[in-house]
Amino acid sequence: MALNATTGKLAWSYQTVHHDLWDMDMPSQPTLADITVNGKTVPVIYAPAKTGNIFVLDRSNGKLVVPAPEKPVPQGAAKGDYVTKTQPFSDLSFRPEKDLSGADMWGATMFDQLVCRVMFHQLRYEGIFTPPSEQGTLVFPGNLGMFEWGGISVDPNRQVAIANPMALPFVSRLIPRGPGNPMEQPKDAKGSGTEAGIQPQYGVPYGVTLNPFLSPFGLPCKQPAWGYISGLDLKTNKIVWKKRIGTPQDSMPFPMPVPVPFNMGMPMLGGPISTAGNVLFIAATADNYLRAYNMTNGEKLWQGRLPAGGQATPMTYEVNGKQYVVISAGGHGSFGTKMGDYIVAYALPDDAK
């Protein structure tokens, strides 16, 4: 929504998910840019959503600049609830091109791949926006989001943007009220909700559990890739390149002292930054690296090893004519990366050309 900063009155609003039952909120700050549409400069807002949609609206009036038609979605809500018949789907989107199937299930061994396939067929799944159920519903993209709080980075001069979407399925299971899952919050309770277990949802007929769809070994049941780095052309609002980012080096059950030579495409928390030199920087992935890429074609230019998880967005600054890139390497508890309290800065050598 947009508010008049002087009066506080609502100027316009746009709903990206109708009757949200999946935790598909808008996770990150929107990004403002001026783009050229039919030869005219249009002030727009880019709003990345957990669904993978990027909604592009004229920020002066809230009208869509990139179409987002309403399309039919799965029906059949839990008892006492409802689902809308349609949801908006932006034409600028990273959402999966096809629904998951049993053939997409994956594992580090034949055993956990088989278990993942069995679990997949036990869940309700009819594609994106399948309603939550007592049976258990596969939510894909998962409620962690294809986009999270890192958002996207826009280079207004080159009219390009950088995005780092990910694709991890989750399982949503409705828990009927009963012992340990009361309708109302107990009077002596101190707060509500945790990162794991039943989310109480006081006042409605069900609690809910939301968990990543993992194999017995703790790996995603969906085959890789799980994370990408991508470039968008803001003149056309099209995706021009997309590449896997991140290795399993720091997610293995045993230490890997040397770099893993292949990009699997890892889950991420954090965002990219773009610089005037046509270079983007990003950490975020579940392996402990800060990386630099060519913004035009996605070529990896450099990577530096971090002492802990880089689940943060880098920043850049200049001192005495020299540019630095800095990242907070603190790790992330629920993400499983190495914890720390480091601030790490990088710069080119003084004799670099």
Language-model segments: residues:
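Beta-sheet-rich non-transmembrane sensory/scaffold domains
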Residues: 1-353
